[in-house]
Amino acid sequence: MVQQIDAPLREDVRLLGNLLGETLKQHAGQELFNQIEQIRALAKGARDGQAEAEKQLEQLFLELPDEELLPLTRAFSHFLNFANIAEQYHVVRSRRQAEFDPDANSPNPLVHLFKKFKDKNISTEKLFQQICDLKIELVLTAHPTEVSRRTLIQKYDDINACLSQLDQQKLTPRERQNALANLKQQISSAWQTDEIRQHRPTPVDEAKWGFATIEQTLWNAVPKFIRELNELVQDNCQQNLPLHIAPVRFASWMGGDRDGNPNVTHQITQEVLWLSRWQAADLYLRDIENLRWELSIQSCSEEMVQAIGSPHPEPYREYLRATRERLKATRHWLAQRLQGLEADDSNVIKSKDELLQPLLLCYRSLIDSNLPEIANGQLLDFIYRVNCFGIELLKLDIRQESGRHRQAISAITEYLGLGNFESWTEQARQNFLIQELQSKRPLLPKYINEPEGSLIGHPDVQEVFATMRTLADQPPESLGAYIISMAEYPSDVLAVLLLQKEAGIQHPLRVVPLFETLKDLDGAATTMNTLFNMHWYKQHIQGKHEVMIGYSDSAKDAGFMSANWAQYRAQEELTAIARKHGVQLTLFHGRGGSISRGGAPTQQALFSQPPGSISGAIRVTEQGEMIRFKFGLEGIAMQNLEIYTAATLEATLLPPPEPKAEWRELMNRMTDHSVKVYRQTVRENPHFVKYLRTVTPELELQMLPLGSRPAKRKVSGGIESLRAIPWVFAWTQIRLMLPAWLGTGAAINEVIADQQKATLDEMLQQWPYFQTLIDMLEMVLSKADANIALYYESHLTEDEDLKVLGNQLRQRLKDAVETLLTLKDESKLLSDNEVLDQSMQVRKPYLLPLHLLQAELMKRRRDYLAERQAEHTPVDHALMVSIAGIAAGLRNTG
């Protein structure tokens, strides 16, 4: 089965593996290379069911001295990263090859979708208008799941470029030899580079990483994507897309997300906002230099002559000179501000239109001069970029927890002698907030709200006020939404609006409640209905609203199935409430990479939403390592832009069917049972927390410098205080994958036992939501491995209570697999997804040694800490590499 993988991909994996082997022999010695080959052979035997091979492997690691564990861990980790590189490049290669074959299916999902629209009699006018109205926004977030250093990511990109060069058909022998030498050099450089950051990245570092994603891939991918889309529209609708088209835009939380992250302050937010504008100005300056070089032509319109003031031999260059100087002035001003210096901002570009209008005049002039081929060259790409990225590159969302806003309002009411706002009833809070929002006077004397004044309240409260003042100083286009995490009540939304008013924000950020626990999801529609019934609020929103659905915390709270169904119901109810009030609703999906945090293939995920919930507009977070997997290469970035566009169009114009009443009834029954089973284990079993902390690397994960955000919301506390990302990450590392299946398998099994399989079969055949849920469950179960989880347990604990719990969990995992196979009438997992199955089979001989090494490293580290009360650096380093390597091998962290 492993041999069925595409030959070019297999050749690339073999080439990278061989070059890594040569590098190891050269830099680490023949002995290490021989040892790695021995381990790899034993691991392949273990994969193929040879119990003796696995025993030999376990014994080998037990006997190795500390200093030999790190190079072994690094070698297997590197191979898995190289396998990822080969797979990503193969996607790009396959797309290119399909274009050479007229009989091949197009890799662009929009091509197939347009045919489907034609078959379904969707009019070209309706399709064209819907494409023009698309509002897809992808929000890059810095959740700590990207374990690879940026330094190594750059080297991986260089390796990718080498593979691309070697694929060229007409390389001379010398060129091929040079390309191979370059590839070996990059692999050698990667081996000589430490995989682990020495320090946690700051929020500014994270923001720069987001800017780099734009610069390196999306800057070119976006205009290429829009050109392809326009060609399809020309072919199918016989029209050109308007120049202002921007179906997909980008925003960021990096530098704006302060929920549980004390490192994100108002100063950091200001720095990131300036950096973002500086990066945009720098990129546009490069573009305008190239554009002026191209536009050396003489022919121009009368409008252009008038704009210049007199005829000129090179009118476009002359006309764009002022825009170039303004971009230089903008970049200089921002550089000065970043250094803490004042500077003249009179020539600074402060809005998208100031940059766009000169470009549009050039475009009109070229068209009027019968030069469309030049108008539709670099200039059109420039226009597309400005419409997509604006002057800010990435709009910055602000996120803060609802309790901080309540504290801030309480500080105000107590200062004014009105009592403690937090102790008031919800109705009293709403009455006060609406009254003050309608008032024309400020709540506080101006000096109270100034940095040099006698600020009121706790430092956390002062930081809320300072953040609001910072937002008041920004160009409106730089800012996105203000997200309220842990939103519960209508007053949570009103409080943020009042704080913005009090800070003097002339163009208030739209306020987006994030409903994330099971209880809050169930109450989301009621909360929004209350707000929509308020006359002042209804006028304020002007017929548009955004609501964010949280996936991570609800799944940690109630388990995958219950959370998933609660999210579905909440979206249905919110859509109905918005429709009732005549409000255009945009749902913002806070998805992660793992299914426990809402991860799923994009097209499946969007098409499985409730009918009507995606009406041409959607926001989605792209988190951590998923940014690199989806947008790290230009070809893959193009593919994902196509997928998002196709999925949004299909969900809008051909929404899935309404679920039948009996389907809903069965889902309600299954989720009730699922949450009960899940919470009995996670909340009620007295040994569960100890099991998590003993058998998984949950505690060790906290030492890995992944992101700027702490792993816990609070310093102390149990499961409830642990963030959803390390929660999922810990179970993934030991391959138990517990958050995704615990409770779900038991719930499905219960209804099958009750003779309900026929209904489940119908749901699986006819309901995209249920199909996606089961597909995602199967994918995660295929990555689970009870034997590996058992090895961690037997290696790390002698506690009989924990062993009993471990046996129960592994039995439930086995039951979940059997239940899924029964449901799908299959004999093995992934029988209908050979690509993923083969990918996992190839990775197993490299993953197994890493798991065995990690368990041994965890044991040694804990023993050292118990005996010496000090850290042991070689073991710590190897342990961190093992965590990163397993994450790479599974293509999932949190």
Curated annotation (Swiss-Prot):
Its EC number is 4.1.1.31. The active site is at H143, K556. It comes from the Bacteria. The keyword Magnesium applies. Transmembrane segments: none annotated. This is Phosphoenolpyruvate carboxylase. It comes from Acinetobacter baumannii (strain ATCC 17978 / DSM 105126 / CIP 53.77 / LMG 1025 / NCDC KC755 / 5377). One of its GO terms (biological process) is tricarboxylic acid cycle.
